[in-house]
Amino acid sequence: MMSQQLIDFIDSRTRHPYKSDEVEKFQQEVNELQLPDPNSLPILSEEEKRQAREDAAFRRSSEGLEDAWLDSAIPADPTPIFRDTVELLCVYQSFVKKSASLDTVANFLDFSTDFSTLSTKKDETEIAPDCLHYIAELLFQKKEREVKEKWKNELTEKLKTLFNWPAINPNLKESSKFESFFGFVRSIQSFKDSETGLPLFMQVYITPYVNQFRYHFMSQKQTNVLSKPEWFFEFLLKVFRSNRSFYMLMRDIKFFPGVPPFFTFINLLNNVAKEKLTHIIKYDDYLVHLVHETLQYSVRLEQHFHYTQDPLIIFLFEQNGTYDKWLGLETQLSLTKLEDIKIASDAWELESDQSDDFSSAVPTKMTVRFRDMIETTFSVLQNLPSLDYQFNFWRSVQLKPMMQYVNWLEAFYESHESSSSIHLPGSLQTDKSKFDIAEVERMCKLYSNFKLLMDWLDDIEDEDVYIRIGHKMGSENYAAFYQVKPRLSTLTNGSFRMILRAVSQTLRPLLDNYSDLDTWVIKEQLPGAALLSTSVSAEIVGFQSRLKEIIALLQKLLIGSSQCEAIYQIGTLVESWMIKIVMTHQFSVRGGVQFAMDAMQIVLEFSDYPLLKFERLMSTVELLSLESGENKLIKKLIIEINQKNYDFIDEFFKTKEITLSYEDALGVLYRRVDAWKD
């Protein structure tokens, strides 16, 4: 039979359950129970347990009923002693006794284990009062709070004493004296703060930094400036830099599976930063700058600390409507800057200070400004956290204004392609008295815009981010700008041809005046008179002067291969014009010599370009200026060529360095009047 003390305890707590403020009473009463050894009690069968449950239920249902009608002569059955009930009460008693001595982590772990056992253990006879588990849980919670508060105080004191926390010394070298502290941290690493749910150590450790953050950036302090997110990001980075060495000493402690403790520290402070971000994103005026600084912060975390977990930019973009609003603001900002670039009064002026950055032409100011505008967005593009974000940003903020810019330039190209009389805006409205040379300048500047854009795109397309974007679009060779580059290539080649056309339209009238001379056939001078004139023809001076001016202009506006190609093309054009003059006129010896002097004067203007040899022109004037002499050399050469006596001709050509074909040489020789005179 069960002892009267046990019966009274069970009976009392069945009828009067413990209340939430009776934890100490529970401890006292359970401690005072005199419990028999459970092993001395019989093991009940399932049928006996069922019967016990029914009896207990009956007794509970009878509580408070009037029993006068019951037959008092029938004695009550004795209360049996049940092993299940006693075993459960033994666990409660052990649990209560341990709650009095929780001075070590091991003791608390043992205490916690007993509570876990209580949580799963039940009295199958259902005799033990139901309130026991409830009040035991309250006891556990109370003791847990007390112990954790004690540990937090201990952590705080040791951190201050050993590490001068929170002003942690970043150059910790002697780690052996800290082993005891880290052993303590390791022993409680699985325990969470009751209020925040954070690991107990981390809750203690981050508290002063969180308080500093809130004080400076979430209060009425002057450091709380919405337009300066870089201030609180720099504060966080400074905190991380000063604490990194400390966390290296405890890198084997894991508060969360797979997460180094230093990253846990960063995560927790980033959570505070998220509160700040959600406040700033309400203001459109600050959103673009906020995103840029958040991206830069994430980059610096990765560069300095190899941290890639939970980027704040993802949190920012996932706030309702924030990403779309930011992208719209970035797009509008780029288009506004583009309009400012186009309408600037100095847009078409040369940016000579930037010429070293380009290999084909001296850029206009608007080209440099447009390039700089796009390049300032590159770091944002590169640092965005996913390809989808990057693609959308590139399409809206880079490609869209680029297409508009090219369309705008193409309109000028089409106007000039159909008529060379249409002026470009800004500084290109030059003096009409110099319209001819100004047209060359305009075409060079138009060409430089197309060419430099083309070269610049070739350079930046090798960046990984553009390769990934090109791959996403499925473009050939993964070229991100495949939509615009073919157009730029066509416009570049076309505007280069327009430079040559403008040069031709400027020079050709002057050379036509020269070719209209009727003095090529001049009577031979008297015997003994000087054959050669001492100066070039007056009529060639205007052509030479304008040619010199054009070459100087091209040297000013074009660079490298573009400059060489343009001047080579002009040299070839001039050579063909001069040869055409020869082939459409007749020359005396004196006229041929004069033409040769004029031609040499023109060739000298190209002396900076040794690859331009003018071999056809030089060979032509060499034959054209031959003296007849007594041997009738001109006629002899004609006869030898006609008779195909090429040995003599080859030897003569070699001596004079003539490279013309026999047919072309014959044509030049016939231009001499003495070739057909007796």
From Swiss-Prot:
What Pfam families does this protein map onto? Answer: RINT1_TIP1
Q: How does it sit in the membrane?
A: Peripheral membrane protein
> Which GO annotations describe the biological process of this protein?
endoplasmic reticulum to Golgi vesicle-mediated transport; protein transport; regulation of ER to Golgi vesicle-mediated transport; retrograde vesicle-mediated transport, Golgi to endoplasmic reticulum
> Which GO cellular component terms are attached?
cytosol; Dsl1/NZR complex; endoplasmic reticulum membrane; nucleus
Q: Which domain of life is it from?
A: Eukaryota
Mind telling me which InterPro entries this protein's record contains? EXOC6PINT-1/Sec15/Tip20_C_dom2, RINT1_Tip20
* Compartments where located: Endoplasmic reticulum membrane
**What are the entry keywords?**
Endoplasmic reticulum, ER-Golgi transport, Membrane, Protein transport, Transport
Q: Where is the RINT1/TIP20 domain?
A: 99-678
Q: Matching Gene3D superfamilies, A to Z? A: Dsl1p vesicle tethering complex, Tip20p subunit, domain D
Q: How does it assemble?
A: Component of a peripheral membrane protein complex consisting of dsl1, sec39/dsl3 and tip20. Bound to a SNARE complex consisting of ufe1, use1, sec20 and sec22 or ykt6 through direct interaction of tip20 with sec20. Interacts with dsl1, sec39/dsl3 and the cytoplasmic domain of sec20.
**Function summary:** Required for protein transport between the Golgi and the endoplasmic reticulum. May contribute to tethering of coatomer-coated retrograde transport vesicles to the ER membrane through interaction with and stabilization of the SNARE complex.
Kindly provide the name given to this protein in its UniProt entry: Protein transport protein tip20
Organism of this sequence:
Schizosaccharomyces pombe (strain 972 / ATCC 24843) (Fission yeast)
